[in-house]
Swiss-Prot record:
Source organism superkingdom: Viruses
Residue positions, PTM Phosphothreonine: 279
Organism, as annotated: Measles virus (strain Ichinose-B95a)
Protein name (Swiss-Prot/TrEMBL): Nucleoprotein
Region (Disordered): 418-525
Effect of residue 279 to A: Loss of encapsidation of viral RNA, but no effect on N-P interaction
Region (Homomultimerization): 1-36, 373-391
Record region (Ncore): 1-403
Compartment annotation: Virion; Host cytoplasm; Host nucleus
Functional description taken from the UniProt entry: Forms the helical nucleocapsid (NC) in a ratio of 1 N per 6 ribonucleotides, protecting the genome from nucleases. The nucleocapsid (NC) has a helical structure with either 12.35 or 11.64 N per turn, approximately 20 nm in diameter, with a hollow central cavity approximately 5 nm in diameter. The encapsidated genomic RNA serves as template for transcription and replication; encapsidation by N is coupled to RNA synthesis. Forms the encapsidation complex with the phosphoprotein protein P. Before encapsidation, the newly synthesized free N protein, so-called N0, is chaperoned by P.
Positions of region (Interaction with the phosphoprotein): 477-505
Record's GO cellular component terms: helical viral capsid; host cell cytoplasm; host cell nucleus; ribonucleoprotein complex; viral nucleocapsid
Name of the coding gene: N
Length: 525
């Protein structure tokens, strides 16, 4: 048996191991297409700001081809460094594209104010053709700008500080698009607006240079469909992270936005580790979880072997990303989602409608959190030096806090996932019973008895105070009391209806201990 277990562990480890890069064959080369990237040919701020203005106008034109749009975006993304050409050549390693750099300088003879640097050759016409979209009169909006503030006609500046603020504002809006351009483009607008408000409050961006939604949609769609552009953006992020010492302000902002980009599309894997394993609830000892725990361990080792590109595997369309989906560990994922819903309010908005979702293990996670409330881990207590008296004090305080949170209907018990609670009694999970359940059931019984007594006494008092509608009302008495006879009759009718509803609810309460809820399996199908 020991040999079998060792062989099983070795099999699982080799099964999830990434393929070895070395081999007898050579590198596979694909058919490359050429991308032209305009970069500044001198160190003048005027050249850079004019190039930025022309590229922003170029990107907003819907008639621009895909490769030309990618080249313009790469040119904007690399404008904040001192030598954009060296940066692009250093970090670009794409088997699908071949990048050609074109240096751009100022020119008074061209309509765009720019020309391509060359040795003795007049390139003004080619520059005008490139920056004017082949037809200068085709788009009035491209000439007026793509900012929400239509008073901004151009973004040409002379000082470096103003240029950095404008460039940082535009780059922030582009980088934020990468966070959900691949994983959730339909719900990206709300999160992008929250990031914009955050950086505006931090004075990292200028609110007047907010780009139009149409312009942002064009860039988001291009990021989603062009893998080469995403490869360049990820390579740029990794290059910034490797830079020692202090970084430029725009580089620090890109690293800050990276916290929303990293691990995009890996929420199931990360949340399963966070709520399913790190919480260390005793439910992990179930035999049903043994195989999936081994799978998750192999995936964690594989994640580490992938290196610095592992958090971006979904953005980079790495085929190994399918191993990390929740379908590889459905029971453990369902259990972790139940734990997460009870512990964090933000988990209530997640979509659990998957074909491999198991409601039973989801409820198992919920019950583990509820019935373990106030308990102190003996292992952590010994490591932290917590005495038994301190542990009892913590448990008592935690129990009161949990009861107060539930009584105020604020916290982990959310309405979004209320349909996932079982429509059976508390005896559905016999292994999770205890003294707390007996106290809860006893309290429910006492509450029902007191409700019946109080309801019957109130009903008798009401019947004595107000006769039923079948008895004729004394109009003279009603007139003397200052009430309208019709109002008194309507009040009596309403009181009788309330009494009838109370009787129905009382009969339902005596039949079942738990309220009737929908069947979660029917709703998830």
């Amino acid at each position: 048996m020991a040999t079998l277990l060792r062989s099983l562990a070795l099999f699982k480890r080799n099964k999830d191991k990434p393929p070895i890069t070395s081999g007898s064959g050579g590198a596979i080369r694909g058919i490359k297409h050429i991308i032209i990237v305009p970069i500044p040919g001198d160190s003048s701020i005027t050249t850079r700001s004019r190039l930025l203005d022309r590229l922003v106008r170029l990107i907003g034109n819907p008639d621009v081809s895909g490769p030309k749009l990618t080249g313009a975006l790469i040119g904007i993304l690399s404008l904040f460094v001192e030598s954009p050409g060296q940066l692009i050549q250093r970090i670009t390693d794409d088997p699908d594209v071949s990048i050609r750099l074109l240096e751009v300088v100022q020119s008074d003879q061209s309509q765009s104010g720019l020309t391509f640097a060359s040795r003795g050759t007049n390139m003004e016409d080619e520059a005008d053709q490139y920056f004017s979209h082949d037809d200068p009169s085709s788009s009035d909006q491209s000439r007026s700008g793509w900012f929400e503030n239509k008073e901004i006609s151009d973004i040409e500046v002379q000082d470096p500080e103003g240029f950095n603020m404008i460039l940082g504002t535009i780059l922030a809006q582009i980088w934020v698009l990468l966070a959900k351009a691949v994983t959730a483009p339909d719900t990206a607008a709300d999160s992008e607006l929250r990031r914009w408000i955050k950086y505006t409050q931090q004075r990292r961006v200028v609110g007047e240079f907010r780009l139009e939604r149409k312009w942002l949609d064009v860039v988001r769609n291009r990021i989603a469909e062009d893998l080469s552009l995403r490869r360049f953006m990820v390579a740029l992020i990794l290059d910034i992270k490797r830079t020692p010492g202090n970084k430029p302000r725009i580089a620090e902002m890109i690293c800050d936005i990276d916290t929303y980009i990293v691990e995009a599309g890996l929420a199931s894997f990360i949340l399963t580790i966070k709520f399913g394993i790190e919480t260390m609830y005793p439910a992990l000892g179930l035999h049903e979880f043994a195989g999936e725990l081994s799978t998750l361990e192999s995936l964690m080792n594989l994640y580490q072997q992938m290196g610095e590109t592992a958090p971006y595997m979904v953005i980079l369309e790495n085929s190994i990303q399918n191993k990390f989906s929740a379908g590889s560990y459905p029971l453990l994922w369902s259990y972790a989602m139940g734990v997460g819903v009870e512990l964090e309010n933000s988990m209530g908005g997640l979509n659990f409608g998957r074909s491999y979702f198991d409601p039973a293990y989801f409820r198992l996670g919920q019950e583990m959190v509820r019935r373990s409330a106030g308990k102190v881990s003996s292992t952590l207590a010994s490591e932290l030096g917590i005495t038994a008296e301190d542990a009892r004090l913590v448990s008592e305080i935690a129990m009161h806090t949990t009861e107060d949170r539930i009584s105020r209907a604020v916290g982990p018990r959310q309405a979004q996932v209320s349909f996932l609670h079982g429509d059976q009694s508390e005896n559905e999970l016999p292994g999770l019973g205890g003294k707390e359940d007996r106290r809860v059931k006893q309290g429910r019984g006492e509450a029902r008895e007191s409700y019946r007594e109080t309801g019957s006494s109130r009903a008798s008092d009401a019947r004595a105070a107000h006769p039923p509608t079948s008895m004729p009302l004394d109009i003279d008495t009603a007139s003397e009391s200052g009430q309208d006879p019709q109002d008194s009759r309507r009040s009596a009718d309403a009181l009788l209806r309330l009494q009838a509803m109370a009787g129905i609810l009382e009969e339902q309460g005596s039949d079942t201990d738990t309220p009737r809820v929908y069947n979660d399996r029917d709703l998830l199908d």
